[in-house]
């Protein structure tokens, strides 16, 4: 079961001609900032990735306002992700007919915006859904029935989880059968002991 978070707005940009290492130097400055503060930081950061992130944040803000109805003042940057893209391999001629390799790296950018209002309620819904999935799993159902048997309790009938009282009846019947077998063995041992004692007295 997948719980969708409607408090997030995402914008992505792929195959940009910049290395992921250089772009991440700018990405670390944006996480957790408000949109207005992030744009101000990018305006005063003289890096190649700054205009790329500015374009991407503006796109994410437009998605948040048009698709989700968020307010611009409540938006914060939850994540600024930079992944490596395909690398273009070229060569440069060198002396004596040799050649050296040139790696033209690319990167994929992604910006995730979150709304400050309603984030806690969404996290609570996700946690409740996760708890329901864990409680209704068959492994937890079987473990609960076994724990009740160990304590000597009879599990209640639960049609949703498939727990039935037949399981407890079977276990009770097996335990009673074992007890009767032990009692029979004890009586047999007592009879043999009395016979041996009588034989010793006769001798």
Curated annotation (Swiss-Prot):
From start to end residue, where is composition biased (Low complexity)? 168-194
* The keyword NAD appears for this protein: no
The region called Disordered is annotated at 116-203
Q: Which SUPFAM superfamilies match?
A: Ribosomal protein L22
Q: Which domain of life is it from?
A: Bacteria
rRNA-binding keyword on record: yes
**Entry GO terms, CC:** cytosolic large ribosomal subunit
Q: Which UniProt keywords apply?
A: Ribonucleoprotein, Ribosomal protein, RNA-binding, rRNA-binding
* One GO biological process term: translation
A molecular function GO annotation: structural constituent of ribosome
Q: Which InterPro entries match?
A: Ribosomal_uL22, Ribosomal_uL22_bac/chlpt-type, Ribosomal_uL22_bac/org-type, Ribosomal_uL22_sf
- In this chain, composition skew of type Polar residues spans 116-126, 134-167
**General function of this protein:** This protein binds specifically to 23S rRNA; its binding is stimulated by other ribosomal proteins, e.g. L4, L17, and L20. It is important during the early stages of 50S assembly. It makes multiple contacts with different domains of the 23S rRNA in the assembled 50S subunit and ribosome.
Q: Which NCBIfam families match?
A: rplV_bact
Q: Which family does it belong to?
A: Belongs to the universal ribosomal protein uL22 family.
- Subunit comment: Part of the 50S ribosomal subunit.
* Name of the protein in its database record: Large ribosomal subunit protein uL22
- What is the scientific name of the source organism? Mesomycoplasma hyopneumoniae (strain 232)
